[in-house]
From Swiss-Prot:
This is 3-methyl-2-oxobutanoate hydroxymethyltransferase. GO terms for molecular function: 3-methyl-2-oxobutanoate hydroxymethyltransferase activity; magnesium ion binding. Catalyzes the reversible reaction in which hydroxymethyl group from 5,10-methylenetetrahydrofolate is transferred onto alpha-ketoisovalerate to form ketopantoate. One of its GO terms (cellular component) is cytoplasm. Mg(2+) binds at residues 41, 80, 111. Pathway: Cofactor biosynthesis; (R)-pantothenate biosynthesis; (R)-pantoate from 3-methyl-2-oxobutanoate: step 1/2. One of its GO terms (biological process) is pantothenate biosynthetic process. HAMAP family: PanB. Its EC number is 2.1.2.11.
Amino acid sequence: MNVEKLKKMKGKEKIVMVTAYDAPSARIAQDAGIDIILVGDSLGNNVLGYENTIPVTMEEMLIHVAAVRRGAPKAFVVADMPFLSYQPSLEKAIENAGRFLKVGANAVKIEGGEEFGEVVQRLVESGIPVMGHIGLTPQFVNRFGGYRVQGKTEKSREYLLRSARELEKRGAFAIVLEMVVEEVAKEITEGISIPTIGIGSGRFCDGQVLVWHDLLGLNPDFAPRFSKRYANLYETILKALQEFKKEVKEGIFPSEEHVFTDKSQGGVSS
């Protein structure tokens, strides 16, 4: 997969993107044939235990982007630019985006609308592919006053439409639409030539993205309305750990087949 192939999928084939934060998850995503792996700054609240994405640092993101690349050497990997990694200056944005490409990312994703058009253009001119992200942008949650659906008012609709056109004009190869009302997401998708990838933005985007932990049911306390659980791995893992605990306590594990003696054959698996 590459940028040009993704752009050609618009209106012809739905694009599938999932987040992944480590090598084993990335390998599974690659083996499943997922089009894009996003190493999201959602790493913060899904893996690192933060309340939101604001505390996530470049150093944390770089470690996880590199891990994902090692786990999925053939995948198209997009790295999220974390809070304050691109906002302070164009120079800072180029430097940090370049660091992501050096550890294996194919592109970066930037949250924000028309006000970040120049940042997108400079990155693209520097040889760094950029995916835009408008609608609900979690890094700006304090400005929005919470996680609220976007595009409900005419002012919001006009801003989103302007932003999508500006990001396209500045060279973005795709745009994530997060929690945008379906009608506006459809209007944006039909009004630009680059793909839109929706999360909580209805049925008419050119693709869809979900967070790894949401679609696999790894967090029993959080289930966004717009997401769908395709598995309940929390319960599966919980039961496995409980069974392991029970067998150890009762002396069932390890059994004869799991131990080495002076007559044992073969090596170890770890």
